[in-house]
Amino acid sequence: MSDDNLAEIRDEKAKKIQHPKGKLTAYERLNLLLDEGSFSEIDQHVTSEENPDGEAVVTGTGTIHGRPVFVFSEDFSVMGGSLGEVVAKKILKVMDHALEARAPIIGIKDSGGARIQEGISSLYGYAQIFKKNVEASGKIPQISVVVGPSAGGAVYSPALTDFIFQVQDIGQLYVTGPAVVKTVTGEEVSYDCLLYTSDAADECSG
């Protein structure tokens, strides 16, 4: 089976999960962002035992108005887009390629955070990504596009990039979700209260 066929099969599965939520798939987002036909996937066959058909991120290179860029698009349809050891390695590799080429790196964010099933390995992966963000600072443009939740450990990397674009009503940046807040503190909060907007700040402060 060709790489294109594998990507198509994976994308069809993702559509069944993403489209009912009003969200696009990882591949659809890349196709909209990049020049038509320019996307070349990196490490498509690098997967974990839990997800042999594809991990929770799609990485690669392409062009925007003819200019080369490197990209990674988190796939919420695979374990909530959570970051495990393999996902971290794929992101780090494409960031290294961007640094070597002196080209922008664009991260499309749609992740529930660390993959708790992998324990400390997922947290170490985040630490390595944050380190790479700092290493790349001032050397290449780093751009985050928040198109879904970017929760827990996933919230910090965008904060270290140069630009953050967030989809209204869908993109969410927060450290801890309402369920965890209620479990730990007993306080009930809405997602709106967790989002950093002036309207939410006024509403939640009373």
Predicted regions: what they are:
Residues V181:
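N-terminal cationic and glycine-rich segments that engage phosphates or anionic surfaces
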Residues A103, K109-Q117, V134-G177:
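Glycine-rich beta-to-alpha active-site loop
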Residues T61-D75, K90-I116:
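A structural preference for short, pocket-lining loop segments at secondary-structure junctions
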Residues M1-V69, S73-G80:
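Intrinsically disordered, low-complexity segments enriched in small/flexible residues
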Residues Y196-E203:
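Conserved small/polar residues in nucleotide/adenosyl-binding loops
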Residues G22, V71, D110, P158, ...:
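Residue-level signature of catalytic and energy-coupling elements of molecular machines
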Residues V86-A101, E118-V146:
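An acidic, glycine-rich surface segment that forms the CoA-thioester-binding/catalytic face
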Residues E74-G80, V86, I108-Q128:
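Glycine- (often His-adjacent) and acidic-residue-rich active-site loop
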